Amino acid sequence: MSPLHPIADKAEVSVDFPDKAYIGSFTRHSQFEAYADDDSVAIRLVRPGEDRREAVMHVHYGLLADILVELARSLASRPELDEQHRTELKEAANQLCRSLEPRPES
């Protein structure tokens, strides 16, 4: 696992069951970690303190690819994002692309 990082923006998580719903917010006082293993990626959100909450989501690579395609379609169909968010997302996407390039054999 990787170290926890501060959340600079925010995330909201909701899980709906037939008889109840769970909703949690993770803001600037929360932390996250994201990591990859052989089959999937995981995102873990942690809100420390008295009202501690933790949410973990594991997504297999095929589903992650489908999600990224749908996010790209959704972003392309809406008004352009502001400069800051556009830059942050482009830099992260470029880093992801570089990490997927074939690596020389050691």
Give the predicted meaning of each segment.
Residues 1-106:
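Positively charged, low-complexity terminal tracts
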